Structure formats: C-alpha cells, structure tokens
From Swiss-Prot:
Catalyzes the transfer of a dimethylallyl group onto the adenine at position 37 in tRNAs that read codons beginning with uridine, leading to the formation of N6-(dimethylallyl)adenosine (i(6)A). This is tRNA dimethylallyltransferase. It holds the Pfam family IPPT. Keywords: ATP-binding, Magnesium, Nucleotide-binding, Transferase, tRNA processing. It comes from the Bacteria. The record marks 105, 128 as: Interaction with substrate tRNA.
C-alpha cells in the first residue's frame, strides 16, 4: 500500500504590520484557498481594532476561520486552538480548497503543524492542592508570581485568573524540572502536513515606522472607544485584556497612565512584540523568508508555493 498523502497547508507568518493580511487574500484568490487565522487574539468578538482584525471588505469573499469565536471574558488554550484548526484544515481540504494559515502567534501555529500532545496527567495531586490553597489564602497574583519566577514564558501567556492553568504549569516544573514551554518543544517534532511555510520580513526601521503608524490609525478608527466598551462591560483580569492594544489603554481608564503615555507604551510594546515574533519564528521553525522592504512579492511567493506543494494557481497556464 502507498503512503497516506498528507494534507497540503500554506502558512504565512511574520511580525505585526508586515503585510500578511493582503498577501494571504491575494494568495487565497490565486490558489483557491480559504484562510485560517493563526492569531490568538482575533478569536475574540468585539475586539476588532486593537487586534487589527481583517474586515469583511478586506476579505473580499474569501472565507476566514478562527475569527470572532469567543467572548472577551472566555479563556482559550493552545490545545483548543490546535483541535479547532486541525478540524478546519480537514474540512477545507475535503472541499477541494487549500487551507492557508495566517498569523503571528508562534506557539499556536506550531502546535497545529507538529505532532504535539497536550495532556492533563495525574501529576502531583498534593502539590496541586497546596497551590490551590495558596491561591485561596494569598490570592491568584501570588501564585502567578511564583510561575513568573520559574517559567516567565508561560506566565506571560497564562492570565493570573486562569488558576488551573497557572498551577498546571507550576506542577509541570515541580515534577519534571522543565518549563511547560520547554516540555512542549521537546516532543517529537513531526510535521503532520505537507507544509509551505512562508515568512515575511522587512527593514526593521521601516517595520517600526509601520507599527507606529498603525497604532495612530487604530486610535483614529476608535480603539479608545472599543476598549472603553469592554471596560464598561466590567471585563477585567481576562486573558483577552492581556493583548497588546488593550492592556495599555486599560491603564488609561484605571488612571495609571495618561492617554498620551498609554499610546506611547502601546507603540513600544508593539515594536517589542514584533521583535520577539521574528526571533521566535527564526529559532523555532524552518521558514522560507521573503523580504518585502521594497514592495510585495506576491508573484514570487505564489511560484514558491506552487513548487513546494505541487499545486496550480489560477494564474498558471
């Protein structure tokens, strides 16, 4: 019997504001594709401006998935993302279309493409119960600070109020001596799909200028009012509000910063995030990079995907 044919998946990654959205839609049109968002924050309804969510007009008729599937007060795990996206890949493939994952949340995308297992093993029950007691007696922030000390990557990703996941990460470190993030990465990295992994990059100063401009545009489009709406709904201490673009403006509404300082901090945090994204993708994934400093490379990228995945575009003769 022949080898089972793996599903074909195109993946477009890159830092915030580099131009992934337009490229992905152009590619989807050319390759008969449908788009899956690989951004961990675009899943939240009513959080449109701050997450730079693709608009209906920009979609131009191309189906998009993993957008507006959760309320801002809901939590969302890497494991749930993995399960949902893999289901979308199957369904898109069954319709004879090409799944195109677009995004910037590296661990989430990696969890889909590779054979990662997320388990809730029995672990150390006594240790877990002790942490639960500490959370009750001394507060969730205290337990979260303990995680920050041993596994800052997980602490940044998991909100303090998500006590179960905070304690799970602490428990993994306690029982194995490894960070949760390291344990995930140590698993056998077998690609589950036939993947074309495209990365967009550009001159750093140009990228930072684009990020600053994007933040100014977000403010003009009504980011302040968008965040105020969440604030007035009483949404506090949720995973969604940890997103860049929201936590900074929350500081303004809670009188911890002036609006000018909040916007300045938003720009700084966005630039730092872009730098972290690039570092993460370069260190963790085998990406073919295209420099778009001098303009888009849609035709070149299209030819690359055609060759890598052995698919034909609508532009092919």
């Amino acid at each position: 019997m022949g080898e089972v044919q793996r599903e074909k998946v195109a993946v477009i990654i890159g830092p915030t504001a580099v131009g992934k959205t337009k490229l992905s839609i152009d590619l989807a049109k050319a390759l008969n594709g449908e788009i899956i968002s690989g951004d961990s924050m675009q899943i939240y309804r009513t959080m449109d401006i701050g997450t730079a969510k693709v608009t209906k007009a920009e979609m131009d008729g191309i189906p998009h998935y993993m957008i507006d599937i959760k309320n801002p007060e809901d939590s969302f795990s890497v494991a749930e993302f993995q399960e949902r996206v893999r289901k979308h890949i199957r369904e898109i493939t069954e319709r004879g279309k090409l799944p195109i994952i677009v995004g910037g949340t590296g661990l989430y995308i990696q969890s889909v493409l590779f054979d990662y297992q997320f388990t809730d093993d029995a672990g150390d029950v006594i240790y877990r119960e002790q942490r639960e007691k500490l959370a009750l007696e001394r507060g969730v922030e205290y337990v979260h600070e303990k995680l920050q000390e041993v596994d800052p990557e997980s602490a940044e990703r998991i909100h303090a109020n998500n006590v179960r996941r905070v304690i799970r990460a602490l428990e993994i470190f306690h029982t194995t001596g490894e960070k949760m993030s390291e344990q995930i990465e140590k698993q056998e990295k077998e690609l589950l799909y036939d993947v074309s992994l495209i990365g967009l990059t550009m001159d750093r100063e140009m990228l930072y200028d684009r990020i600053n401009l994007r933040v100014d545009l977000m403010m003009e489009q009504g980011l302040l009012e968008e965040v105020e709406g969440l604030y007035n709904r009483g949404i506090r201490d949720c995973q969604s509000i940890q997103a860049i673009g929201y936590k900074e403006i929350y500081d303004y509404f809670e009188n911890r910063a002036s609006l000018e300082d909040a916007v300045s901090q938003l720009k700084t945090n966005s630039r730092r995030y872009a730098k972290r994204q690039l570092t993460w993708f370069r260190n963790k994934m085998d990406v073919t990079w295209f420099d778009v400093t001098d303009g888009e490379k849609t035709s070149e990228i299209l030819r690359y995907i055609e060759g890598k995945l052995q698919v034909k575009s609508n532009n092919s003769k």
